[in-house]
Amino acid sequence: MNTILITGCSSGFGLETARLFLDRGWRVVATMRTPRATLLPESDHLAVLPLDVTDAGSIARTVAEAGPLDVLVNNAGVGLLNALEGLSMGSAREVFETNTLGTIAMTQAVLPQFRERGAGVIVNVTSSVTLRPLPLLAVYTASKAAVNAFTESLAHELVPFGVRAHLVIPGRSPETAFGTNARTRMGMDVPEAYGELAGQVFANFQQATEELTRASDVAEAVWRAATDPACPMRLPAGADAVAWAAA
């Protein structure tokens, strides 16, 4: 039985991906900062483990407890929404620690077993803001664009060992907690000079008429990356992301 470890399974894309792989007969290691086993159906093929991707000890313990893996999905992330002038450097570092360095650290932790076995897949979930930049998201976009570049380079690095690395690039989804955690970090404290721009951005978010991304779109893209060796290295997920990638 194949085993997948997914970070950030408390909601949204990670939770839906865990459900899909469970339904399709995989062993799933669903991780989150504070484990809640009731989020997923009881199964002998499910392990719900605590994981903080910014903590080296937490990573080591979780990877050891998970056992042999076939696929790693780096999905854990935090949002940050504000004008650059309104951000503290502490907030910016927190976003990079989770979104960028957390992804790198998790990948580094599982690579030895993949390389030694000559097989394995790494799937990094980023964001369509790397395809179509938006205001008030400069630091968040940078953290995700760094993961794109990391993954693209890593994919070449791992070819000699039979290990694959892929990007799944979701569009905007109301099914994620991005807005909630982004506004928490923003503190709703947009500098006065950017007030009008912020109002326009929030209004555009609320009035969007384009087709958005569903969590199931992302889960299916992760499934394809995990199971289809012929799939592209970059996979936009969701109608909006697909359209932006083609533009």
Name each model feature, range by range.
Residues A83-L84, S91-R93:
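Substrate-binding pocket helix/loop in short-chain dehydrogenase/reductase
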Residues P50-R61, M89-G90:
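The beta1-alpha1 cofactor-binding region of Rossmann-like NAD(H)/NADP(H)-dependent oxidoreductases
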Residues S10, G14, A18:
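N-terminal Rossmann NAD(P)H-binding glycine-rich loop of SDR-like oxidoreductase domains
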Residues S127:
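Residue(s) in the substrate-gating loop at a strand-loop-helix junction
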